[in-house]
Amino acid sequence: MGLFIKKPFAALQAEANESGNKTLKRVLGPWSLIALGVGVIIGAGLFSITGTVAAGYTGPAITLSFAIAAIGCCFAGLCYAEFASMIPVAGSAYTYSYATMGELIAWIIGWDLVLEYTVAATTVSISWSRYLVVFLEGVGINIPHALAAYPWDGGIVNIPAALIVVLMSIFLIRGTEGSSIFNGFIVFLKVAVILIFVVLGWKYINAENYVPYIPANTGTLGEFGFSGVLRGAAIVFFAFLGFDAVSTAAQETKNPKRDMPVGILGSLLICTILYMVFAYVMTGVAHYSDFAGQQGIAPVAVAIDHMGHADATGVIHPDYPWLNRAIVLAILFGYCSVIMVTLLGQSRVFLSMSRDGLLPPFFSKIHEKYRTPAHSNLLFMVIVGGLAAFVPARVAGEMTSIGTLFAFTLVCAAVLIVRKSMPDVHRAFKTPFVPTVPILGILTCLCMMLFLPADTWIRLVLWMLIGLDVYACYGVKHSKLEHNVKRRKGLTILNMTGIALSVLSVITGLWHQQTVGWEEDKTLLAISFVFAFTHCAFYMVRIWKQTSEKKK
C-alpha cells in the first residue's frame, strides 16, 4: 500500500480500548463534552460580529444568517459525529483520514489541524490581551503599550497574551479533569451573561426595529436583501468554528461512542439557539443602522445604551450601565476556555501522530502522575506563547478559518468513502441523508474557503510544504504501519505533491499581488517564490535519486 496504507480498523479499536497508567485518563461525560464545545465556539465574535453584520449586510435578518450558517456547519458536524462514534480515539480528522484515505492524506490533514489549533489559540490569546488592557484601564490600571502589543503595532512584546497561554497550558498538563471543571465554570459564566442580556433586554424590544425584517438591497450584491442575508451567513459561519475540537478528547471520554455525537451536535445546537436569541434581542432594542461604524464590543454597548428610559428631551438613560463591564469580564473568562480547548486539541493530534510513528515518540509520552501528554503541551506552550507575543492577530485569525474549513472538507469526503469501504462497521451514530449531507458540507466549506484573502492561501500552501518536508524526512521512514519496509511505494506521488505545492505557492503569490496591487509590499510574494524554487529543487533531486536507485 505504501504511503496510502490505511490504519486497520482493528488497530483503532484496540487503541480506543487501551487502559492503564500510560494512557489518557477517562474523566469526561456528555455534559463535559458539550461544555468543551460551547467553550470553544462562543467567543467575543458573538458580541462584536452580530452588530457589524446587521448594520452592513442583513438588518434584523441577522437571525436568518445565523440559522443558515448553523445548517451549513451542521453538515460537517454530522460527519464528525459519525466518525467520533465509530473511531473514538484522539486525533480527530487526522485519525479518520488515516482509516479511510491513507497515511499521506492523514499526514496532510494532521499537519493542517496543528496549524488550525495553533493559530486559533494564538488569535484568541492576542484578543484576550486587548480586552484585559481595556478592562484594567476601566479600573485605573494601565499596562504600557510596549508590553501589550506586537512589534508591528508599535510595541515590543505582548506579555499578557503569552502569559495566558502559559497559564492554560499548566492547567492542561495537570490533568483533563481539573481543566474540564474550570472550563465548565467559564462556560456557565459566559452563557449566564448572554442570558442576562437577553432577559433584561427583552422588555426593551421595539417591534418597529424589525421593519423591514430584510431591508431592500442597495443595488450592490451582498448589501441587504436576500443576497445580504447569504453574505452575512458566510461571515457569521466562522462564529461556529471549533466544535471539531470536541472529537480530539475521545480517549478521555468515559463512553465515547455514545457521548461524542452528543457533545458535538449538542454544543452546536446550544450555540445556535444562543446566537439567534442574542441577535434577535440586540436588533430589537436598537435599530440595526445604529450599529454602523462600531468596533469590538461597541455594537453591544449601543444596544445596552438603548435598554433604558428616555427623559423629557428624548435622551435615553441606560438602566444597566454595569452590563458592559460584565460582558468584557465574560469575554475575558470565555477566551480562557477557548484557548484551553484549542491547546488540548493540538496536543492530542500531535499525540496521535507520534503514536503512529510519524512524529518522534517523545511527543506521545504520557505523564505518569497526571496522565496527560505533557511533552506536547509544553511544546505548544512555547510555540503558541511565542506567536501570541509577536504575531499580528489578523494573520493568525484568517489562518484559523482556512485550516478548519480544509479539515471539515476532508472529513465530509471521508464519510462518503467509509460508507463504501466499511459498510458493516458498527456506528453508534449515522450521518443522515448520505451522500447529500457530506456533499453539501464539502460545497459549503469550499465556498467559504474561496472567499478568504489570497495571502491566507499562500500561508496555507507554505505550511503544507513545511509539513511535507517533515513527513518526507521523518514520517516516511518511521511509520509504524510499514516500519520494516526499506523502500516504500508512493514516493513518486509524494515528490510530485511537493512540486505541485511549489507551483501553487507561486500562483497564490501572484494572485495576492494582483489583488493588493503590484506596487504594494512584495514580501509575501518573494517568500512564496523562494519556497517554490527551493522545494522544486528538493523534490526533483528526490525523484532523481529514486530513479537512480531503481536502475541499480
Feature map (PLM): residue ranges:
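TM-loop-TM module centered on a large, flexible mid-protein loop between adjacent transmembrane helices
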Residues: T95-Y96, G102, V133-H145, A216-G219, ...
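C-terminal membrane-solvent junction of multi-pass transporters and transport-like membrane proteins
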Residues: D153-I156, F363-T372, F408-R459, I466-S502
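Membrane-interface "cap" regions at the ends of multi-pass membrane proteins
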Residues: M1-I49, A55-P60, A67, C74-L78, ...
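Hydrophobic, membrane-embedded alpha-helices of multi-pass small-molecule transporters
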Residues: L28-F47, P160-F171, G201, G219-V285, ...
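Membrane-helix boundary/coupling elements in multi-pass transport proteins
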Residues: F47, D112-R130, I235, F240, ...
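Hydrophobic alpha-helical segments and their helix-loop junctions in multi-pass secondary transporters
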Residues: S129-G138, F188-N217, A279-A286, A413-V425, ...
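Membrane-interface loop-to-helix entry segments
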Residues: S129, I156-A207, I264-L268, T400-L410, ...
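Extracellular loop-to-transmembrane helix junctions
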Residues: L3, K25, S48-W152, I270, ...
